Amino acid sequence: MVSKVFMVALMLFAATAGAESSHYTGIKAVPDIKVDFQFYRVSGPDVASLARQMTNAGTARANGHIGMASYQLSWQLQTRPEAQRCELEQVRVTTRIKVMVPNWMDKARASAAERQKWDKLVAAMFDYESRHKDILLESVSQLGIQLAQLSVERDCAALEYQAWQRGQGVLASSRQRFSQLQQQTDHGRKLGLNWPKGI
């Protein structure tokens, strides 16, 4: 009985030893991630006056929003054409995230109640924008893994196209998750971003 099991294992090894993998293996995925927090200045005696000012300042500085998280995601394959196939040597995934939020310049002169209101709003804003950032960082990780395990191609242009398809799939998934987050939180209002609907 033992010898039969050993023979089966030996035959399986012999059958797979010469087989070439259909996917690239051992590829290093190099993430290049930078997060930039930016603040735009707002002034006023209380949160209500800030809300009015941020409608205009936010429109000018944050694409019509009080706060904003924007991103860029790109990828690059380092390849080498060989006689039998395109060799994939390295994958680089580059991400740039910019988070923009208001900074209340007169906060120290405001009442304790107004400062507390502001702190709650800013905390909710950071929570909401950070959730967008976290979705993107998960997508970067997922994309790096997928690109490092692409199917082997004979032609490097075909490999680049395969990577482009994977990247588009990850981007579409990210956009869907962003949309779900916006719906689930009512654009952050359920987290405490309780501004008037027009802002």
Each PLM stretch: what is its role?
Residues 118-122, 143:
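Mature extracytoplasmic/lumenal regions of exported proteins
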Residues 124, 128-136:
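Active-site recognition of the HExxH zinc-binding catalytic motif
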